[in-house]
Amino acid sequence: MDLRTGEYITAHQATSGVYTFGITNPLYFTITRHNQNPFNNKYNTLTFQIRFNHNLRKELGIHKCFLNFHIWTTLQSPTGHFLRVFKYQVCKYLNNLGVISLNNVVRAVDYVLFHVFERTIDVTENHEIKFNFY
């Protein structure tokens, strides 16, 4: 849903994309929170954010695009190592597709978390997306 207008994102907006070779460093990854063994459970929770680069947003007609993911996992790896491997695998998936779009980024995250990484329990996603009016 567009955060500004409240309208749903159309299929055309979600699937329109840009070739990966046309833009350098299209995505910015950051870990916003990491809880190790909350309430003495056997899992960790990670919250990370994927932001679209200015050039990618300009090509797609997006004013703002933040994809926030909250992950429950039993992996015990350090957060820096997790982020580095996650970023590499997502970029590798997108390079193999050749096109970056909203749907492809969400598919890449789903593929990496559930097929590349083992022991992912659950993932929730929320987003802040604003499309350009003009």
From Swiss-Prot:
Keywords annotated in UniProt: Host-virus interaction
Intrachain disulfide bonds: none
Signal peptide per UniProt: none
A Pfam family annotated for this UniProt entry: Gemini_AL3
GO terms (BP aspect): viral process
Family according to the record: Belongs to the geminiviridae replication enhancer protein family.
Known partners and oligomeric status: Homooligomer. Interacts with the replication-associated protein (REP). Interacts with host proliferating cell nuclear antigen (PCNA). Interacts with host retinoblastoma-related protein 1 (RBR1), and may thereby deregulate the host cell cycle. Oligomerization and interaction with PCNA are necessary for optimal replication enhancement.
Function: Increases viral DNA accumulation. Enhances infectivity and symptom expression.
Protein name from the UniProt record: Replication enhancer protein
The organism of origin for this protein: Tomato yellow leaf curl Sardinia virus
